[in-house]
Amino acid sequence: MKIHDFKIKKQEQKKISMLTCYDYPSACIVAESNIDCVLVGDSVAMAVHGHPTTIMATIEMMELHTQAVARGLGKQFLITDLPFLGHKSSQGHTVENVKRLLQAGAQAVKIEGADKDTCQTISHLVNAGIPVMGHIGLTPQSIHQLGGYKVQGKNSEQAETLLQQAATLEQAGCFAVVIECVPQELAKTITDSLVIPTIGIGAGPGTDGQVLVWHDMLGLQTSFNPKFVKKYFRAKDHFIEALNSYVQQVQQMHFPANEHSF
């Protein structure tokens, strides 16, 4: 998938599938699938490193995981999150951070928020030839300011703000925008108001595409079960079954067998 395909898919009313990915083996699996695009999300800080929020993601962490995913990925378009405060200092510092991610293998970056400074930064990056995906609604890097993981845009004032933010991000040059945890009717209204495609997570079926976290949709963990996640596999259960089978076979001397020995 190439960057121009995002707008083409919206025009042709073909849904976009996006999935997070954080390591080389997972990327090799995704490469053999029909997934359109991959996000090396700052959710790696939680899903892989065990932190309680995405705020702990660093540019070094994002760079390392982007390199790993890029080595294994195939035809999918690769986007990497700019981590917490990665664009809140000088524009020069922001460009340097983005440069590191692109050199690591990313084809675009995703930036959360739509305040004036953020939109100016996005415009600056786009003018420099760097593709940027926006992100509105529940923005995990602002979780403390938002007061927790809550649905956004539930009243008319918040809804109008999100509509304005989406329009501003489009004007700033974003090629797509993620809409996270907003009422489905609002997400559909935002989607219909934009030329660029929207990617939803917890935003209903009316967006131009969907994104889920690898560990969530494969059932690799069971402690975090948001309403918007559908588990397509029970990987944790199968992994535990395999581990226990290995232990049993070692104890009963069924492994290694002759076929596994020299």
From Swiss-Prot:
Name of one Pfam family that matches: Pantoate_transf
User: What InterPro entries does the database record attribute to this sequence?
Assistant: Pantoate_hydroxy_MeTrfase, Pyrv/PenolPyrv_kinase-like_dom, Pyrv_kinase-like_dom_sf
Q: What is its EC number?
A: 2.1.2.11
Q: GO CC terms for this protein? A: cytoplasm
The active-site annotation reads 180 (proton acceptor)
Q: Any binding details for the cofactor?
A: Binds 1 Mg(2+) ion per subunit.
> Where does this protein reside within or beyond the cell?
Cytoplasm
Q: In which pathway does it act?
A: Cofactor biosynthesis; (R)-pantothenate biosynthesis; (R)-pantoate from 3-methyl-2-oxobutanoate: step 1/2
Keyword line: Cytoplasm, Magnesium, Metal-binding, Pantothenate biosynthesis, Transferase
Gene Ontology molecular function: any one: magnesium ion binding
GO biological process, alphabetically ordered: pantothenate biosynthetic process
Which residues hold Mg(2+)?
A: 42, 81, 112
Q: What class of enzyme is it?
A: transferase
**Highest taxon of source:** Bacteria
- What cofactor is this protein dependent on? Mg(2+)
Q: Which reaction does it catalyse?
A: 3-methyl-2-oxobutanoate + (6R)-5,10-methylene-5,6,7,8-tetrahydrofolate + H2O = 2-dehydropantoate + (6S)-5,6,7,8-tetrahydrofolate
Family statement drawn from the similarity comment of this UniProt entry: Belongs to the PanB family.
The subunit field of the Swiss-Prot or TrEMBL record says: Homodecamer; pentamer of dimers.
Protein's job: Catalyzes the reversible reaction in which hydroxymethyl group from 5,10-methylenetetrahydrofolate is transferred onto alpha-ketoisovalerate to form ketopantoate.
Q: What is this protein called?
A: 3-methyl-2-oxobutanoate hydroxymethyltransferase
The gene for this chain is panB
